[in-house]
Amino acid sequence: MAEKRNIFLVGPMGAGKSTIGRHLAQMLHLDFHDSDHEIEQRTGADIAWVFDVEGEEGFRRREAQVIGDLSERQGIVLATGGGSVQSKDIRNYLSARGIVVYLETTIDKQVARTQRDKRRPLLQVDDPREVLESLAEIRNPLYEEIADVIVKTDEQSAKIVANQIIEQLGF
């Protein structure tokens, strides 16, 4: 696996993709990118605005373009959006262009980590837990389908999880 130089982090909201990704990139001396941040940079607006104006379909179109572009680079760690795996094109990009690491977490941890975050449009509802459970049913099999490595993120610091990923990848 070590011949694939890019590392792509997939997993649900609140799994720690961005935080762990930054640690991982620093430890491996790779460039770090976050697909949501890149979308915001390219549009000049936050994700919530893109959802409001263009809907989820418009956001997903932008996400596929951004991940397609970023995954063509070499030597990066990319934190993807939680729903990106719902796109077959994105799953194909990630599988073909790097090592895919699924950061797995429980619904309880997701709720705890995202409850005060107003930047997550899909969770601005009365019962975010119900939304997270519904998304998990759809997305978890897709994360598993493309994962080269699965790492649980519930009980450990981001730095420890990054070290576990490095060990599992043999870097």
Curated annotation (Swiss-Prot):
* GO cellular component terms listed in the entry, alphabetical order: cytosol
Q: Name one Pfam family in it.
A: SKI
> What CDD domains has UniProt attached to this entry?
SK
The lineage's top-level taxon is: Bacteria
Which compartments is it annotated to reside in?
Cytoplasm
Q: So, what pathway does this thing act in?
A: Metabolic intermediate biosynthesis; chorismate biosynthesis; chorismate from D-erythrose 4-phosphate and phosphoenolpyruvate: step 5/7
Residues engaged in binding ATP: 14-19, 120, 156
Q: Which Gene3D superfamilies match?
A: P-loop containing nucleotide triphosphate hydrolases
Q: How is the cofactor bound?
A: Binds 1 Mg(2+) ion per subunit.
Q: Which major enzyme category is it? A: transferase
Cited NCBIfam families = PRK05057.1
- Quaternary assembly: Monomer.
Q: Which family, according to UniProt?
A: Belongs to the shikimate kinase family.
Task: Name the chain's protein.
Answer: Shikimate kinase
Q: What is the lineage of its organism?
A: Bacteria, Pseudomonadati, Pseudomonadota, Gammaproteobacteria, Alteromonadales
Gene that codes for this?
aroK
